[in-house]
Amino acid sequence: MDYQVDTLTRFMTAAQSADAIACVPDLIATARDAGMMVIHVVVAFRPGHPEVSPRNPVFSALKANGMAGAGSEGAAIHPAAAARAGEPIVVKQRISPFVGTDLETLLRANSIHTLVLAGVHTSGVVLSTVRHAGDLDYRLVVVRDCCADPDAEVHAMLLDIVIAKQAAVVTTAELAGALTGRSS
C-alpha cells in the first residue's frame, strides 16, 4: 500500500526506501503464485486537491506541496510494486484505504476474509488499515520486511506491540513458507 514514488522518496531516506521496496517483488510474486488476489492501494487527488480539508494536516501538506496529484510522476506506483493487467488499484484520498473507496466491495465480492498487508508508512496506511480491517473482522497478516516508516523507533513499536495485537506479523520468507508448506 502506498508504494508510490513520492511516498518512497520524499518522506524517507534512500536507505529506508530501498529496504522498504526490496522485498515487494517477492511478496507480490508469492501472492500471485498462491492464487491470491493482489490489490494495489495508492493515494491520489484530483487537480487542486478538492478532497483535502484544511482540517487534515497530513493531506494539507501534500496539497500545499502539489503532491499526490492523480496521474503525476510522484503518485505513480513504484516499478517494483507495479500492478499487472487486471489487478485492481484502489485510489484513496484518506489514510485508510477503506474510507471512501470500493476496497470493501472488492473484498466481499471475492469472498476474501484474510488480508495480507504491507506498505509505507507503518504509522500511516499500515496502522490505519489494520485498525479498520480489524473492526470489520478480517483476519490480518502484516509483512514486516515490506513495511517502513520514516521513524524507525515508531515502526518497530507499532509492529511489535500495537499491530501484533491484531495481526500476525511475519516476514516475506515466513509468508512464502506458510503458503507453500515449507518452513523458512
Where on the chain are the PLM-derived regions?
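A short glycine-rich beta-strand->turn/loop micro-motif centered on a GG-aromatic cluster
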Residues: V116-G119, D137-A152
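Active-site acidic carboxylates
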Residues: M1-R84, Q166, A178-S184
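Active-site-proximal loop->helix
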Residues: P150-I163
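Internal catalytic-core helix/loop-beta-alpha segment
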Residues: A70-V120
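Short glycine/serine/threonine-rich phosphate/pyrophosphate-binding segments
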Residues: T122-T129
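Glycine-centered short loops/turns at secondary-structure junctions
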Residues: D33-M36, S111, D137
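Short acidic-hydrophobic, aromatic-tinged amphipathic segments that line or gate anion-handling sites
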Residues: V90, A168-L175
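Hydrophobic beta-strand scaffold residues
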Residues: V38, L140-V142, V169
